[in-house]
Amino acid sequence: FKVNVFHWHLTEKLAWRFEVKQYPQLTANANMTRYPGQYYTQEQCKELEAYAAERGVTVIPEIDMPGHSDVFTKAMGFGMQTTQGIAALKNILDEVAKAFPLAPYIHIGGDEVTLNDGFLEEMTQYVRENLGRKVITWNPLKNKAVASDKADMTQMWSSSGKKIADMPNIDCRYNYTNHFDVYADLVGIYKSNIYYQQKGDAEVAGTISAAWNDTKVKTETDIIKQNNQYANILASAERAWIGGGKQNIEVGGTKLPNKGEEFEEFADFERRFLFHKAHSLKNEPIPYVKQTNVHWRITDPFPNGGDATKVFPPEQNTDDVLPTSFIYDKKLYNTSFATGAGIYLRHIWHSIVPSFFSAPADNQTAYAWTYVYSPKEQQVGA
């Protein structure tokens, strides 16, 4: 598979996962609030980077600064933007560079926190001049403009992120898989172009599939399954390598067309992915099953006046086969044909990403139904 970058987010507010020999308190049990004491040694980092390099994969280590740094502040007794904090971060970056000798870039974060004047500029200068590496930051920053004095590449993480001229930008704004439905959002990834373009260029470097395991789950396997990790990564990689995508997800959304070119292209991707699920990935935890053969009828939304228990004609109908339209309060309510195992009536990012309903609103009730074939009479759970 043509996946050529592993972005390793090594620090967060809950835990610090990178061994810093000069500051062992960062990885002490008492200073982590999730999975205390679990971290990667520098030897493990070197080993993983070498393993990745043999397979054509570049590792991008990230030490997020100065935000997402609760563990740092707790362990060190001072914040990252203090004089002591800046000195400590430079020592930490020295160790990061030694643990990742092949990494052309070091990611220094910068997001979701108010930046002091000169902080990112000083850290960027240090990485460039003292470590000989290039710098990646998140985009946007909270209170500063991203510019060449702060980064050599940016990673767009929200809808307000815009590409910065004269440097490469990674677009992962709508590729946060921890928000995703297993089925509908895979369609969105595959249908969408990357940053409104058919092909990459000097300013659009590609995309990254980001699995933020902010919510604690029972096992690491659950992270892979619940993020539909394999399918999402391979859909992202294919779109990044071959380009295309009829339109951006901000226009096309996650709705799978019932027929046509986009449907045929996705069906072909699905066929190839399910082949790998059955063969080269047969031992991996993959929840995805074929969805291009799943069809629904979905009603126009009925106004419920804020009462979600209110009953409408589809529930009152006793026919074996439901009709394709209903009369309620002297008004005609039609149904629409839909394809796919997951249908967003309103997307989690509904103000930006279109869904099945063009204008979803509060206090509405809609009905969706499909038919399930069973080769024998049996009872199943729902």
Task: Locate each region found by the language model.
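Flexible, acidic glycine-rich loops studded with aromatic residues
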Residues: S148-K150, S158-N293
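Aromatic-lined ligand-binding clefts that engage carbohydrates, nucleic acids, or primary amines
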Residues: Y373-S374, Q378-A382
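Edge strands and adjacent loops of beta-rich recognition modules
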Residues: L345-D362
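Hydrophobic faces of well-ordered beta-strands that scaffold small-molecule active sites
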Residues: N4-W8, V59-I63, I106-I108, V135-T137, ...
